[in-house]
C-alpha cells in the first residue's frame, strides 16, 4: 500500500441549528461542521412528520374542474 495518500482523520464537533452538538470524526479540516438539521430536530426522527395526501389533490382537481365526460371528447375532437 502507498503511504501518505489518505487525508488526516481528526475529531470534529458537529453543531446543529437547533443547538444540539455531538462529536464525530471527519477528514474536513477545522474541527467544526455546522448543519441545519440533525436527528434531534428532523421531523422524521421527532415523529412530527407531515404526510402528504396525493389522493386529496386529485379530489380537489376533480372538484374544481369536474370529471371529463365521454360526450365532451367527441365535441372537442370534431370541432375543426
Swiss-Prot record:
Binding site residues for Zn(2+): 16, 18, 38, 41
The keyword Zinc is annotated on this UniProt entry: yes
Keyword Metal-binding applies: yes
InterPro entries: Ribosomal_bL28/bL31-like_sf, Ribosomal_bL31, Ribosomal_bL31_A, Ribosomal_bL31_sf
GO CC annotation terms, alphabetical: ribonucleoprotein complex; ribosome
Gene3D superfamilies (alphabetical): Ribosomal protein L31 (4.10.830.30)
Cofactor binding annotation: Binds 1 zinc ion per subunit.
Keyword entries, A-Z: Metal-binding, Ribonucleoprotein, Ribosomal protein, RNA-binding, rRNA-binding, Zinc
Cofactor names: Zn(2+)
PROSITE patterns: RIBOSOMAL_L31
GO process annotations (BP): translation
GO molecular function (one): metal ion binding
Function field: Binds the 23S rRNA.
Quaternary structure and partners: Part of the 50S ribosomal subunit.
Similarity comment: family membership: Belongs to the bacterial ribosomal protein bL31 family. Type A subfamily.
Name assigned to this protein: Large ribosomal subunit protein bL31
Gene: rpmE
Amino acid at each position: 500500500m502507498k503511504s501518505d495518500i489518505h487525508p488526516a482523520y481528526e475529531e470534529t464537533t458537529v453543531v446543529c441549528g437547533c443547538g444540539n452538538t455531538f462529536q464525530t470524526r471527519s477528514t474536513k479540516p477545522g474541527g467544526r461542521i455546522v448543519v441545519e438539521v440533525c436527528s434531534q430536530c428532523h421531523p422524521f426522527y421527532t415523529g412530527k412528520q407531515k404526510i402528504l395526501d396525493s389522493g386529496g389533490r386529485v379530489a380537489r382537481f376533480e372538484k374544481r374542474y369536474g370529471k371529463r365526460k365521454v360526450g365532451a371528447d367527441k365535441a372537442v375532437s370534431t370541432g375543426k
